[in-house]
Amino acid sequence: MYGRGKRKSKNQKYFELFRKFQERQVTYDWHTASFQGRNNYCKTDPDATFMHMKDDHMRNAQLKPGYNIQIGVDSEYIVATDVFSDRKDVWTLIPFLKTMDEKLGFRYPSVTADSGYESEEGYTYLRETRQTPYIKPQTYEKWKRRSFKQDISKRENMAYDAETDVYTCYAQKKLSPVFVKKQKSKSGYESEVTVYECEDCKDCPHKEKCTRAKGNKRLYVSKSFLEKRQESYENILTETGIQYRMNRSIQVEGAFGVLKNDYEFQKFLLRGKTKVKLEILLLCMGYNLNKLHAKIQNERIGFHLFKVKSA
């Protein structure tokens, strides 16, 4: 019932209110579907995610819509690339490797990646596929610092008895396992975390430097992750591991440097993940053609890895 001088009935009011709620719900459902597991998306390009860009030199925390581009490099050629909406590299490793296996038709015997790709799930996947990991631990650089080595709160600086499964802290107190809990990652991977608790932190003169907890000091340890991390850590310290890590830095970062700076490709011209992937594929093809031409000119055909210079 509409028009001047007419009062709407209660049913009419309820009906119109319900219709507004229904329209809002449809809009909210569409927005929720557009998130695709993210906490934000760009209205002009729903596949894009707001991220911190490296061009924010003043660190003003500027957020811009973008994509996480991953490339795989072999012998200085880009052999695989993919586009992700997730901002963290760690969640792109397994999907990227699966795409590589599918597209290339074979599997590389080893995988070299930066510390941003390290996770228990990634290590487990590489072990299942029988690929040797050369992944730098996330705490690799911290381990070298004097402040880390002198931090009594760190598990790495505590003595560990493998037979009794007990840690000993700086004050010579025992940290024993009290329970095991399950943790699920974003992708659904389930890991076991053993919780260790100190026998008594009361009146300990070092408590302020060791823990902020009101009660006893606790450690949360994934034994499976530590075992796999140690394996990868030992791999990167070998001669092969050192050479692979050096070449990852030269070839992968070098490829991104050429694409961004030499080609001056700072911004995608198209929108949507499918179109962006097509754009980066064409760009990588051009890069590979230029790389092939440069290798022919410099008589470097068959050259795969840069050698480590002896000190």
Set out the residue ranges of the language-model regions.
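Anion-binding and metal-coordination hotspots
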Residues: 1-311
